[in-house]
């Protein structure tokens, strides 16, 4: 993976262990850097410092605000996965990224298992989860409801042993416009991860694992995953959720 590994913390051994676990190698010529500070693990673009750093933070900031003041059970993603009344499905988020969608679902009572294929993103996500587990306000439900699995793809799971109610997919998709307003997370992610060119291959294994439905988040302008028409869609201003029911 093309990235610099920089330790700015007092936790040299911990940072070494993270790099070993995720098989990260230092590349001194990269303009992307994974940086361990005393507070967190973060991603920086060294040649564009004004972008700031990207880190996973469930405890405060925008994710905390969304949990407290967002739509809750009225959020589109919550409706898309089938939450209704006292029913909260078990979910695999197979393209977890920074864990933001999974956090919304866990916050309203869903049990979410996360899979992230990119090791740098996986390291960031694990760091954010570990800090959230220790938080007095949200730690109790985070430890129960958000778990990062030691797999890089759902293809490594066994449908007989690992099935859940819902599999959620949100693969990276090319941006329609080169807008200067693209979020810093997306700018860094697009350089780090690129687009998921093999995302079509996720639909079939997802359907094998999902007892009730597969939910695919797409930009409104995007084609259906694997060119397969869903049973129905739920649309928002910029995105839609394509829903494939298990038959």
Curated annotation (Swiss-Prot):
Top enzyme category: transferase
One function term, GO molecular function aspect: rRNA (guanine-N2-)-methyltransferase activity
Keyword rRNA processing: yes
EC number: 2.1.1.242
Localization, UniProt: Cytoplasm
Keywords associated with the record: Cytoplasm, Methyltransferase, rRNA processing, S-adenosyl-L-methionine, Transferase
GO cellular component: cytoplasm
UniProt main location, coarse: cytoplasm
Residues engaged in binding S-adenosyl-L-methionine: 116-117, 152-153, 170
InterPro entries: 16SrRNA_methylTrfase_J, SAM-dependent_MTases_sf
Reaction equations catalysed: guanosine(1516) in 16S rRNA + S-adenosyl-L-methionine = N(2)-methylguanosine(1516) in 16S rRNA + S-adenosyl-L-homocysteine + H(+)
PANTHER family, A to Z: RIBOSOMAL RNA SMALL SUBUNIT METHYLTRANSFERASE J (PTHR36112:SF1)
Function recorded in the entry: Specifically methylates the guanosine in position 1516 of 16S rRNA.
Record family assignment: Belongs to the methyltransferase superfamily. RsmJ family.
Name used for this protein in its record: Ribosomal RNA small subunit methyltransferase J
Species for this entry: Glaesserella parasuis serovar 5 (strain SH0165)
């Amino acid at each position: 993976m093309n990235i610099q590994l920089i330790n700015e913390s007092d936790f040299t051994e911990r940072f070494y262990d993270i790099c070993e676990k995720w098989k990260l190698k230092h590349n001194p010529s990269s303009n992307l850097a994974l940086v361990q500070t005393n507070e967190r693990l973060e991603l920086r673009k060294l040649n564009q410092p004004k972008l700031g750093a990207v880190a996973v933070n469930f405890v405060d900031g925008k994710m905390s605000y969304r949990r407290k003041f967002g739509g809750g059970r009225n959020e589109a993603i919550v409706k898309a996965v089938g939450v209704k009344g006292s029913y909260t499905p078990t979910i695999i988020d197979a393209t977890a990224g920074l864990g933001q969608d999974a956090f919304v679902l866990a916050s309203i009572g869903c049990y979410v298992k996360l899979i992230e294929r990119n090791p740098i993103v996986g390291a960031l996500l694990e760091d954010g989860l570990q800090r959230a587990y220790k938080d007095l306000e949200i730690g109790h439900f985070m430890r129960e409801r958000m778990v990062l699995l030691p797999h890089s793809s759902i293809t490594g799971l066994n449908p007989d042993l690992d099935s859940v109610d819902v599999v959620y997919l949100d693969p990276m998709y090319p941006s329609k416009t080169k807008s200067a307003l693209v979020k810093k997370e997306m700018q860094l992610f697009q350089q780090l991860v690129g687009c998921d060119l093999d995302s079509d291959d996720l639909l079939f294994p997802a359907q094998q694992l999902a007892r009730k439905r597969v939910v695919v988040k797409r930009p409104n302008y995007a084609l259906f995953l694997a060119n397969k028409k869903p049973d129905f869609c739920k649309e928002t201003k910029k995105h839609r959720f394509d829903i494939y029911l298990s038959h």
